[in-house]
């Protein structure tokens, strides 16, 4: 049983959800910065609010958490133990939203990068160089 009233819990959750960036986001941002690349974080003027973006080059970067965005979903959805219907619906909604965001941005000339958070943690240099290459290709076309 929760010691806080629903209103108090809502206030606490809202206060703690200020987006400061996840570890994978911060790590990739650090590598991009070291390459001399200047990005925007969570730019709400771009549909889907990418984690990092280069508006000038129309490049949007999303670093997705494996659970929240349904990595290996066909297998992992059966691992959920409690409140199964809620979580399956929630994650599938997130996956559908990700697809809509991708489709919209691509149809408007954007290059989309979607990386899994754990992959970024393992090899941030690889992903930062991939982004750098895409920016270069956008510059010379």
Curated annotation (Swiss-Prot):
One GO molecular-function entry: endonuclease activity
SUPFAM superfamilies referenced in this protein's UniProt entry, alphabetically: Restriction endonuclease-like (SSF52980)
The protein's enzyme class: hydrolase
Keyword Cytoplasm attributed: no
BP-aspect Gene Ontology terms: DNA restriction-modification system; mismatch repair
InterPro entries per the UniProt record, alphabetical: DNA_mismatch_endonuc_vsr, DUF559, Restrct_endonuc-II-like
Keywords carried by this UniProt record: DNA damage, DNA repair, Endonuclease, Hydrolase, Nuclease, Restriction system
Enzyme Commission numbers on file: 3.1.-.-
Alphabetical list of Gene3D superfamilies matching this protein: VSR Endonuclease
Domain of life, per lineage: Bacteria
Family: Belongs to the Vsr family.
Protein purpose: May nick HpaII sequences that contain T/G mispairs resulting from m5C-deamination. If unrepaired, these mismatches can lead to C-to-T transition mutations. The very short patch (VSP) repair process counteracts the mutagenic process by repairing the mismatches in favor of the G-containing strand. This enzyme is an endonuclease that nicks double-stranded DNA within the sequence CTGG next to the thymidine residue that is mismatched to 2'-deoxyguanosine. The incision is mismatch-dependent and strand-specific.
Protein's UniProt name: Type II nicking enzyme V.HpaIIP
Higher taxonomy: Bacteria, Pseudomonadati, Pseudomonadota, Gammaproteobacteria, Pasteurellales
